[in-house]
């Protein structure tokens, strides 16, 4: 149940009728009623809901917004069920203050819907693909990858909760120049390990981790590939190393609570001819031309600032060409929406990719790109640039060891993705109210403690229909119920905007309101009817808080 949306619809219908009555009475004039919104005001003194109808209607009516609002309010059917007060405020908002009766259906709905409270069917089963992380398989996962993992998985959870059929996908960059350099670097380490003279390319991979990888390769194959064809040797080394690296990436992501439905190989696009077909089809459509021995895509025809090479002068397709084929493949697999989580450094890639898809006949709006900014780790008040253990960048595995999965996932989605994130390791480890995830989890654990205490006294949470919920009249109780009632709307809004940071804000507010309620109201009150009602409220809070944390991929502990 979404009591907030139901109430908004009812108020919107009442305003529409009142505006029509005011027009019939000659008090206002308009040709067509504009699309207006009813929102929850941030300032509680402005009531429970505020409508902007009069502000939008003023120009047609040729009156001030306040005069239009006053005319509409005069013709509202009275009494409106559940409405305690209607007033014109500010420049012409129509504010509604409701009586507490409108909140009564919320708590029974929460207990009935349980782990699906907040879910909806907005997506109606439409197929959506979320591609995220897609890290370079030649290395380990860094903080940018970690933020992308938390962000992408939370977005996928949100879309599932609002009724989409979601596929999580990891794109394996196992083709192109980087893999060629990776193979040459592995080959050099292999030959060196077997006593041969060899040097790593200047732009190759110089990390010591390749020494260990080659050592395991030799343990399995010995010098079998020492005197073989160099191309075969590199192929075998790359195949072995990529399998190891991808296994490590997969394990790290699983430890982070992220699992994928599809691992898609870039090389498969070349092997199947999909890249060549995409280029040929763009050429047939008139969007490919030759210059300086290379083939170029006319990205400027679609609003980009410059055209882009798709085939180099040496005849090798670019990464962009493979990306065109990959995204075409996504739509060929039947996805109605395709969502990519990319680093902000890829912002220039968005317009040209959308242009290529449009050139191939696809609606570019079906591709949505969420860009995320950099992450900076702080420890002891200073930027932590390198791992103290390895001397290289801090990996996801090390972060999980340092602060735990829950804190890492929560911190990574606390801010909007296009904001730089300063990740304070000391704060993430602290067990205090200053730590946002600890604060929220502690609220859940405290609720569970209350329910255990009640059980020890022979008390259970009663069925909501058996509780006199109208007894919940304390301001702290009512504010808590209002926050619980706002959860379905919060999920829908966060899913629509692809903004999971809204959930962390909601979780913090819900935890704060619960702590205030706990301070103001004795849950296990002497009055048995009040006690029953408060137990229902506490259980509804627990369910809602757990549901928020689960969408974020964070556990809801029963003890802390």
Curated annotation (Swiss-Prot):
Which parts of the chain are coiled coil?
none
Q: Where is the signal peptide?
A: none
Location(s) in or outside the cell: Cytoplasm
Reactions that this protein is recorded to catalyse: tRNA(Arg) + L-arginine + ATP = L-arginyl-tRNA(Arg) + AMP + diphosphate
> What broad class describes the main subcellular location of this protein?
cytoplasm
Q: Which Pfam families match?
A: Arg_tRNA_synt_N, DALR_1, tRNA-synt_1d
Q: Which GO terms describe its cellular component?
A: cytoplasm
Q: What is its EC number?
A: 6.1.1.19
- State whether keyword Lyase applies: no
Molecular function (GO) terms for this protein are: arginine-tRNA ligase activity; ATP binding
Q: Motif 'HIGH' region, which positions?
A: 135-145
Tell me the keywords, alphabetical order.
Aminoacyl-tRNA synthetase, ATP-binding, Cytoplasm, Ligase, Nucleotide-binding, Protein biosynthesis
Q: Name one GO biological process term.
A: arginyl-tRNA aminoacylation
Q: Which PROSITE patterns is this protein grouped with?
A: AA_TRNA_LIGASE_I
- The answer, when asked if ATP-binding is one of the entry's keywords, is yes
First-level EC class: ligase
Query: HAMAP family of this UniProt entry?
Result: Arg_tRNA_synth
Listed under subunit, the entry gives: Monomer.
Member of which family?
Belongs to the class-I aminoacyl-tRNA synthetase family.
Q: Which PANTHER family match?
A: ARGININE--TRNA LIGASE, CYTOPLASMIC, ARGINYL-TRNA SYNTHETASE
The protein's name is Arginine--tRNA ligase
What organism does the UniProt record list as the source?
Moorella thermoacetica (strain ATCC 39073 / JCM 9320)
Gene encoding this polypeptide?
Answer: argS
